[in-house]
A protein has these predicted regions:
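Short, polar/charged alpha-helical segment
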Residues: 10-12, 21-47, 75-79, 127-135
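Short loop->beta-strand "edge-of-pocket" segments that line small-molecule binding or catalytic clefts
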Residues: 11-19, 109-122
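Short, low-complexity disordered leader/linker segments with a strong preference
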Residues: 1-12
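Alpha-to-beta junction loops
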Residues: 42-44, 58-68, 80-83, 114-117, ...
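Pocket-lining segment of extracytoplasmic ligand-binding domains
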Residues: 71-72, 151-205
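Short helix-initiation/N-cap motifs at beta->coil->alpha
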Residues: 46-56, 69-71, 138-158, 169-170
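Small-molecule pocket liners
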Residues: 26, 91-97, 103, 194-198, ...
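Flexible hinge/capping segments at coil-to-helix
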Residues: 100-116, 202-205
Length: 205
């Protein structure tokens, strides 16, 4: 009989990612591909959706972790959810408002009377939109806001909207790869708030 100890049973961990499969989650993909999580005894299950939904699921321990914006944690705590922000994922707030370069939208004030696409009125995208508008003394009533789901790159490329709110590593990169230059308005240039991070619950930690 072998004297080697039996390998410990893997622990199942659910991680909610508030988007669709994307380059921004590359560290998790690499970790799974190279077996880093498996070597640590973790069976990692990734799921994609909306971060406001995952916040509730993490709060009741249906999911153990999520990647979400700091503001969502504050809102969750205010609602009594036992969620905790434990790891900074970005050093800068990752969301921008981007547009085709020929639209000449380079600063918040130039969004007035423009059609702006956004996944919905929630999460990091909505926080960035509100912050950027406020920097110019604008409100949502000063723009035409359209909920377009996660179709930002296509919506901007096809001129369905003048600009869209997206992660800097997503929509603007997709257009750049297609040869379409863009302008980007970054929230961090006007307001510094906690960026997205790894969120868990008090039971897990």
């Amino acid at each position: 009989a072998s004297d080697e100890p039996a390998a410990p049973a893997s622990e199942s961990v659910k991680l909610g990612l508030g988007f669709i499969p994307s380059i921004q989650f590359a560290p998790y993909y690499v970790g799974i591909e190279k077996g880093f999580f498996q070597d640590a005894g973790i069976e990692l299950e990734l799921s994609y959706g909306f971060e406001n939904d995952y916040l509730k699921l993490v709060g009741i321990d249906e999911y153990q972790f999520m990647v979400g914006s700091g503001d969502q944690v504050v809102l969750g705590r205010a609602q009594g959810l036992p969620v905790r922000y434990v790891l900074n994922w970005y050093t800068r707030f990752p969301v921008v408002i981007f547009s085709k370069a020929d639209r000449a939208i380079t600063q918040p004030a130039e969004l007035a009377d423009k059609t702006v696409g956004i996944p919905g009125a929630f999460g990091a995208s909505y926080v960035a939109l509100r912050g950027i508008l406020e920097a110019a003394g604008l409100t949502e009533q000063d723009i035409r806001l359209e909920s377009i789901g996660f179709t930002q790159a296509a919506a901007v490329s096809e001129d369905k909207v003048d600009a869209a709110v997206d992660y800097a590593v997503n929509g603007p990169v997709v257009l750049a790869l297609a040869g379409t230059p863009t302008n980007q308005i970054a929230l961090d240039d006007y307001l510094v708030i906690p960026a997205n991070g790894l969120v868990t619950n008090e039971k897990t930690i």
